[in-house]
Amino acid sequence: MLRFLTAGESHGPGLTIIVEGIPADLPLLAEDIDRDLARRQVGFGRGGRMSIETDRVTFRGGVRLGRTIGSPIAMTLENRDFKNWEVPMSVSPVDLDDEAVRAQLEAKRITRLRPGHADYPGAVKYGLADVRNILERSSARETASRVAAGAIAKQLLRQFNVHVHSHVVEIGGVGAGESVRPALPTFEEWKDLFERVDQNDLRCHPDLYERLRSRVVEAAKGGYTLGGAVELAAYGEIPVGLGSHVHYDRRIDGLLAGAAMSVHTVKAVEVGIGTAAARETGADVQDEFINAAGEIARTSNHAGGIEGGMTNGQPVLLRAYLKPLPTMRKALRSIDLVSREPFEAHYERSDTCAVPAGGVVCEAMMAIVLAQELQRKLGGDSLGEMLRHAGRTHA
């Protein structure tokens, strides 16, 4: 079954991604992955690094002649900024007798703790006096690896007409509580929504764009950051019964929520109407069954496509809430890890708003969980075998 591992630091030579368990004979090109990597880098309010890095994946194994071969897929992403960090991020020991080398190391040493980051707990956990080693791995640069792995999961899901996408629904409180889509979108309506969303740099419905953009501009001028919310949707031919009710760790809502919560800055996740269900009566939040020309159908999708820990055939809907980035031009109060002296927190290059990019990363994690559960249900070592088990003759 699909699993993945990533390695690499934010300012190191690059990122390495290994994806295991993908069936043989899945069509896969670098462009399939680069497309999502580019979507991750889009976003009004992104910082300077997006002008430095243009991510292009390189396959190192597991793919031959444009198709997977059943072995682990190895990929790398280059960090173009590494040329400016070769000494402080050197893998090999450096000459500490060289004054210039010592100066470069000292310039990149961080002891001033940044509130809201992994700095303090990481330094304590690993016994470090320099937070650089924590910052490098906890950086959101790592999410490029997840997007690469998720793009492969999406490609597998597409063979079964399952599609995963996201759109920004709120930034800095603007858009909260509004609905920009039909209550029960058709496949074509979902497709049209996401085509329109990907045409702007906030990855939101056009009706929200100007208001969200103005909010980001306001924050950039004020030197502060903004969070927001994204809706995640898996739509198409969603199989009934992904996940299970039999154990806590097999319930797909828990798996999906956990995957989304693992994304940097995500602080809350809702399934379906989420917290709104707590304010309604039982009769108001259930999705009633109807007979639609002999087919079982529903009058609503308040459950977000999940009942009893299993998919029920409707679109799977989640909403992820992302906090404002903790790194700001307006420094926060902190202390020095070593001296305990008060300081203004260290400023590392950052974004004003990373919510659009966060949606793409959450998509990747959602796709990985759905692909894992699809494999668990269907089995098979090749795409053809999986398709046969699903009763399909072709993708």
From Swiss-Prot:
CDD domains associated with the record: Chorismate_synthase
Binding site for FMN: R137, S138, S139, G308, K323, P324, L325, P326, T327, R349
GO MF term set: chorismate synthase activity; FMN binding
Textual note on the cofactor: Reduced FMN (FMNH(2)).
Keywords associated with the record: Amino-acid biosynthesis, Aromatic amino acid biosynthesis, FAD, Flavoprotein, FMN, Lyase, NADP
Broad class of enzyme this protein falls into: lyase
Family: Belongs to the chorismate synthase family.
Protein name: Chorismate synthase
Source organism phylogeny: Bacteria, Bacillati, Cyanobacteriota, Cyanophyceae, Gloeobacterales
Gene assigned in the entry: aroC
